[in-house]
């Protein structure tokens, strides 16, 4: 890339090197399967809890009306805002979400810093952990009155 092109896209090399470093860290973590599964399950738990908050806010506003107008659109915005916080909490808790790992693994495969086997192991462990966290919250909610 020429010096002139680098000025046009200053973050390109920085972003790619950051993603490749993240891939190396994630690959090392996947070697510690139990710990990696815990981080992935935590992301699933956070996602599920904030989805319940999103659903609750949306349904709460859908039941309200002011001047004959339903507040459902405001509820959808409030619910989406609450759900957006899930991604922030996942980031700050250093949990592992499958969607971010797909981006990291794709960049790693493109630049040939990882192989298909390592990539599939990483994605498989992350998916399993995310589903375990989601499943745990689902089982807990089935036995509660929160969704009534």
Explain the meaning of each model-derived region.
Residues 2-148:
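Alpha-helical transmembrane segments and their helix-helix packing motifs
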């Amino acid at each position: 890339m020429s010096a002139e092109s680098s000025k046009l896209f200053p973050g390109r090399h920085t972003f790619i090197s950051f993603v490749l470093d993240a891939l190396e860290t994630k690959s090392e973590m996947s070697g510690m399967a139990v710990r990696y599964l815990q981080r992935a399950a935590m992301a699933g738990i956070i996602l599920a809890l904030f989805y319940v908050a999103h659903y609750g806010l949306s349904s709460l506003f859908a039941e309200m009306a002011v001047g004959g107008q339903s507040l459902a659109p405001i509820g959808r915005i409030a619910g989406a805002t609450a759900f957006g916080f899930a991604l922030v909490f996942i980031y700050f808790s250093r949990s592992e979400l499958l969607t971010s790992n797909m981006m990291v693994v794709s960049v790693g495969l493109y630049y040939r810093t990882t192989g298909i086997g390592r990539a599939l192991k990483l994605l498989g462990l992350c998916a399993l952990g995310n589903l375990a966290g989601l499943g745990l919250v689902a089982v807990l909610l089935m036995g509660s009155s929160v969704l009534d």
